[in-house]
Amino acid sequence: MVEGIPKRWKVLSGQNKWKGLLDPLDPDLRRYIIHYGEMSQVGYDAFNWDRKSRYAGDCYYSKNRLLARTGFLKANPFRYKVTKYIYATASIKLPISFIVKSLSKDASRVQTNWMGYIAVATDQGKAMLGRRDIVVAWRGTLQPYEWANDFDFPLEPAISVFPVTDPKDNPRIGSGWLDIYTASDSRSPYDTTSAQEQVQGELKRLLELYKDEEISITFTGHSLGAVMSVLSAADLVYGKKNNININLQKKQVPITVFAFGSPRIGDHNFKNVVDSLQPLNILRIVNVPDVAPHYPLLLYSEIGEVLEINTLNSTYLKRSLNFRNYHNLEIYLHGMAGMQDTDGVFKLEIGRDISLVNKGLDALKDEYLVPSTWRCLANKGMLQMDDGTWKLDVHRRDHDDDVDADDNDDSSTSNQLQELNTD
């Protein structure tokens, strides 16, 4: 069901702002959006959320093994190679769900978290996608209702990212969003530069490397990751850093954002800046019962085009008063696979495994016989020592200098939940 994507990728990436594709939802666009949502889901599946681990806030896997270990490659025609990890820090106090801090005194990262990755389509992926696609996938947060209550989201001038000539037009962005994107820590061995600098530096390298090919840059993320996707994409286009020179002529690389469950980011001036940027196309996917896209409530403006889904219509899901469920990315992707049009009908149009819904939730109806929160490391990361005792010491077992590692070899996915040794 991907035959049309290589020929239609420009339209699917928003060249015409998705006019005529959203209601009813175009079949190719449905698969296309799910693909980028799954690339964002990799960030959740690879992230160490356990604050009892001294490696909390890190990624379990190396770049070479990330896509295979998270199961992304199985039966997936879209192939990518991960080229860089993104790390972020914070200089202000943020909710724990933003920057996860280990409770261990021996923690490897006190203020630094793994925030996502950059990947480029392989030759095989290029054939299936119609061009050399560069993806910036940002990791999100699991507990939006915690930060909605605990974080007051003051607006802050974003002149450092979007300088304007008239102070009255100065865009303002939520201070938490801006801090995660622009803060740096010179003491960190992982992100002495800011997430902003890391992303722009790697994209500059990749654009130069593939400048003689047809290229696109696609940003994707969920929740906090959706915010970072919009912010980093707008920053790139605003600074004209998506321009490449070919034979003394400038060429603009198209930029697309697929933002799942994104909170609001900035004020009306920020919206005006984003709306003026070309070629920048933003599609926000919003689940009707999810409250996160409506926060913060005051002084913030919504941006981009909107595709609404409603997972309350799914016949596979339990009815729940737990609003956290409706924000979950796997719930979003389930909704994308089955949504029809505005008449409220729900029918799975793509054979996306419904068991993925229960990966981190208890949301599927019991009749489907899928255990709740089934995805976890073997023994929850507890490793047995030589003396017979057990210790929580989960970290990456595969290293980036492992020349035999191949992220396009999906044979290793059967071992993706094995213990992660530290050596």
Swiss-Prot record:
Region Disordered, annotated ranges: 399-423
Segments traversing the membrane: none
Localization in the cell: Cytoplasm
Source domain of life: Eukaryota
Molecular function (Gene Ontology), one example: phospholipase A1 activity
Keywords in alphabetical order: Coiled coil, Cytoplasm, Hydrolase, Lipid degradation, Lipid metabolism
UniProt entry tagged with the keyword Lipid metabolism: yes
Coiled-coil parts of chain: 194-217
Major subcellular site: cytoplasm
GO CC annotation, single: cytoplasm
Catalytic residues in the record: 223, 290, 327
Pfam families: Lipase_3
Comp. bias intervals (Polar residues): 411-423
Stretches with biased composition (Acidic residues): 401-410
EC number per UniProt: 3.1.1.-
Family: Belongs to the AB hydrolase superfamily. Lipase family.
Protein name: Phospholipase A1-IIalpha
Annotated organism of origin: Arabidopsis thaliana (Mouse-ear cress)
Lineage: Eukaryota, Viridiplantae, Streptophyta, Embryophyta, Tracheophyta
